[in-house]
Amino acid sequence: MKQYLLLAASAFLLQGCQTSKEDIKEQPLKMIEQIDFSHVKINDNFWSPRLSKHVSATLPVCSDQIENQTGRIRNFENAAKGEGEHSGIFFDDSDVYKALEGMAYSLINNPDPELEKKADEWIDKFAAAQQPDGYINTFYTLTGLDKRWTNMDKHEMYCAGHMIEAGVAYYQATGKRKLLDVCIRMADHMMSQFGPGKRHWVPGHELSLIHISEPTRPLY
């Protein structure tokens, strides 16, 4: 009896799970859209203390490392002047961009005029370091622009990707688009270098090109 009931139940479930190709075609596609983080406020008991620690400890340490303990921000200053040596490793620009992205996320839930002022100061340095053709990378600006885009392992696209992530995040957090415009010029420069009949590389941070499409969509 138990075996019969089990068999009958299985048959009933299988029958309910059957879907014809016609049924599948008639079902509307449901698009999943990412929610802009600037529309999200976090105030729960688990994450709020961690976000507070991010503001009070993580960001100050990151800023100190970038401005005082290493030459990362100085690389942008030197690149803007077109003189001086590059300090650190070739992908160090990305660490500055990551820290700025962290500032942007923090400003949503913890507005801080001083933190925003520091972010704006960094962005001014980025913009000053950008080349007339849109290229921005302090390593090659200071070691030889003739060598740019010759070695995929040197993280040029990777650094550009993190800059774009930071630029989009800061625009969403503050409405300020100075860094976003720097990112657009760099993206346009990369489009002039890569594609059919041009260079063929695997991008180092392809998701950033998707993220920049949202705030720039009305422009194209």
Question: How should each PLM-predicted stretch be described?
Answer:
Residues 15-16:
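C-terminal motif of bacterial Sec signal peptides marking the signal peptidase cleavage site
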Residues 93-105, 160-163, 176:
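Conserved beta-strand->loop/alpha-helix structural units within folded catalytic cores of enzymes
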Residues 143-209:
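A conserved hydrophobic secondary-structure block that centers on an alpha-helix together
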